[in-house]
């Protein structure tokens, strides 16, 4: 089984890449693929670049060239739900776009025409994650949270951005810039997927400072959770 893992930034894939005993690097269209093993599993690790287009391009290249049987997205996210803290982990059971609006044509806000309004994380992977992380976080000051992640081609920090997202997605747990695009490509290729992100900021007016300070912590937390999950796949 080949497992695809995708992160947008170097910081988000570095720990996973360093976990590979040997690595083959392949660059296609600016997307950096690292082929090797993690936890005894065949892995294709992608540093896609930031944003929905980069994420969709890289995921499509991964699906077409490397034929992964599972895709997992790692990285950071901005917390939107009450009670979330930096270092908490969000496992997404649903994903949506926060900046797509074709409601004039009868679609739900966030829905791309002829695509589902929400992309569902794989039920089997979600169950595995829930079992693993219940034990993993039992003695930790951080926690794992499950729920809706909303993807935007913007870094969310302003009150007006919050208001728009909460208006259409009142149960949103976190926001970021790639996951729904990865989920859409996985959906179109019929590849099971799971999104595991760690909170780097609280998507508020201090978000840029928090992100710069805590991106490495979030990346480490997310990557560690993924390595634990790989042991069970």
Swiss-Prot record:
Matching InterPro entries: MTA_SAH_Nsdase, Nucleoside_phosphorylase_d, Nucleoside_phosphorylase_sf
Gene3D superfamilies: Nucleoside phosphorylase domain
GO biological process terms held by the UniProt record: L-methionine salvage from methylthioadenosine; L-methionine salvage from S-adenosylmethionine; nucleoside catabolic process
GO cellular component labels: cytosol
CDD domains membership: MTAN
UniProt-annotated binding residues for substrate: 78, 156, 177-178
Keyword list, A-Z: Amino-acid biosynthesis, Hydrolase, Methionine biosynthesis
Keyword match Amino-acid biosynthesis: yes
Protein name, UniProt field: 5'-methylthioadenosine/S-adenosylhomocysteine nucleosidase
Native organism: Listeria monocytogenes serotype 4b (strain CLIP80459)
Gene that this sequence comes from: mtnN
């Amino acid at each position: 089984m080949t497992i695809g893992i995708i992160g947008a930034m170097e910081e988000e894939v570095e720990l996973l890449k360093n976990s590979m005993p040997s690595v083959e690097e392949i660059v296609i269209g600016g997307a950096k693929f690292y082929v090797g093993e993690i936890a005894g599993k065949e892995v294709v690790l992608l540093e896609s670049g930031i944003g929905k287009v980069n994420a969709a391009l890289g995921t499509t290249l991964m699906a077409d060239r490397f034929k992964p049987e599972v895709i997992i997205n790692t990285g950071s996210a901005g917390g939107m739900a009450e009670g979330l803290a930096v270092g908490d982990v969000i496992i997404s059971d649903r994903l949506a776009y926060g900046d797509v609006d074709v409601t004039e044509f009868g679609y739900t806000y966030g829905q791309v025409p002829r695509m589902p309004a929400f992309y569902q994380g794989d039920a089997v992977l979600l169950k595995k994650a829930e079992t693993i992380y219940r034990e993993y976080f039992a003695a930790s000051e951080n926690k794992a949270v499950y729920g809706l992640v909303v993807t935007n081609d913007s870094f969310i920090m302003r009150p007006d951005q919050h208001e728009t997202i909460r208006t259409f997605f009142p149960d949103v747990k976190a926001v970021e810039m790639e996951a729904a695009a990865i989920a859409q490509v996985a959906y179109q290729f019929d590849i099971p997927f799971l999104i595991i992100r760690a909170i780097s900021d609280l998507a508020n007016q201090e978000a840029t400072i928090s992100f710069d300070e805590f991106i490495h912590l979030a990346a480490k937390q997310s990557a560690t959770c993924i390595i634990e999950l790989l042991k069970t796949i």
